[in-house]
Amino acid sequence: MNRVYSAGVWVSRNPGALPASGGLKIERCAFGAEHINAKFVARSYRQHIIRRQSRLCPAGCIGKIFCPFLIAMANTILVGAQWGDEGKGKIIDVLTAKVDIVVRSQGGNNAGHTVFHRGAKYILHLIPSGILRRGKVCVIGNGVVIDPIALLGEIDRLRKLRITIGRNLLISDCAHLVLPYHRLLDEQRELRRGHVRIGTTKRGIGPAYGDKAARTGLRMSDLMQPIVFSKKLHAKVIEYNRILQALGAKPVSFREANESYLAAGEKLRPFVGNTVVYLHRAMERGKRILFEGAQGTFLDIDHGTYPYVTSSNTTAGGACTGTGVPPHRIDRVVGVMKAYTTRVGEGALPSEDMQLTQMLHSLGREFGATTGRKRRCGWFDAVATRYARMINGIDELAITNLDGLDRVDPIRVCIAYRLNGKRLNVPPCDAGQLANCEPIYTHVRGWNAPTHSARNFSQLPAAARKYVRYISELTGAKLSMISVGPERSETIIL
């Protein structure tokens, strides 16, 4: 009988159906499930990839074994299921232990992933979080927009912290560049919006993606060719300076920009190459890949609370277009969500609560990793998270910041919205309508006890266990991980 092992490796129990090359070693794991030892999985065995545990193999297999211990063998997309700042950096850091490659697929240095390890705090903006673990390769994909100056600064900061950066970092030659005029235009646009600001980080991300869509952007491949880069940059500086001067802003110096970016390009040259080919060859060798998302579902340019969004696709689909890896090579999607809800910047947040916000700020929590801005806080929003699960095809959820509710009693949970007297179970597309939605709450008993020392589910207070089960039920997705603190060790694997 044919079976699917380890979330995606297809083999046949019929010896005649197996390739003649190599041996097949089947073991029984600690969970009592049979699986193939990863060291013995030949390239020819990875013939059929399934995306979910519940799906049958395309070859028509009718039986399968699912090994939770080896779930990290799968190619995994990790996405934020809220408005960003869900604690993805910590979850990525935990998952990275069982993968070989970590890939960033979209966004720029407007995002910030915070990772705590052995008392040290690391904030990463462009480089994937896997850089903090030895033996992992980090890839910045074609969907990312890169400010070379900012990237070099991040590399220098990490090296000062004795983090090795060399052959473990690859940068796509197709990634677009963020240039000085992008930052200036971003700032000027935000200033002129007055009271109707989007809340941009003013890092030039939106204008850079605008040039990409208009097919006039500069890419890393241009930067690797000094003459080509200088020619293209000169034309763009002339174009943008007309716009900037019309807005009353200082023009960009072509000479300064050209010299600084070419110098940065030479320093980055050893890292730049064809990352699409690298990733496909890695998959052929059975390497495990984690696709690291930036921001969150409701900041997605298509599916977010437009126009209060970022300029890239932050949902699971963006991981494929931003890396060149086809959808059928993805085995699972993990959504990360806080035990409550937060948002930085403008835009609707239906479950926002000022009292909860003030309490969390008083505890030193909820300040943006990139800008340091105070985050707006609200109760857990099951309406939004259910919709995020639908859009991303989330297979399992990781809850973070459960310890943030240790002193809260009672706890509210938003189970639906009310708009013009009508109950809504999905968020409206229009930003104005979403802003006018009233949350419909249910109340859950708090636990009034610390959770940060819990290392397995049974060690959580009974009320905390009930709470996480409840939000799992509301979202319709199983929980795989609970974070009760910033350190790697402060994690409960379910």
Show the residue positions of the predicted features.
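A general signal for intrinsically disordered, low-complexity N-terminal leader regions
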Residues: 5, 18-21, 45
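N-terminal basic, low-structured, amphipathic or hydrophobic segments
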Residues: 11, 15, 27-33, 41, ...
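Small-residue helix-boundary/cleavage micro-motifs
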Residues: 20-23, 32-33, 38
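Non-transmembrane, aqueous-exposed alpha-helical and coiled segments at domain scale
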Residues: 72-494
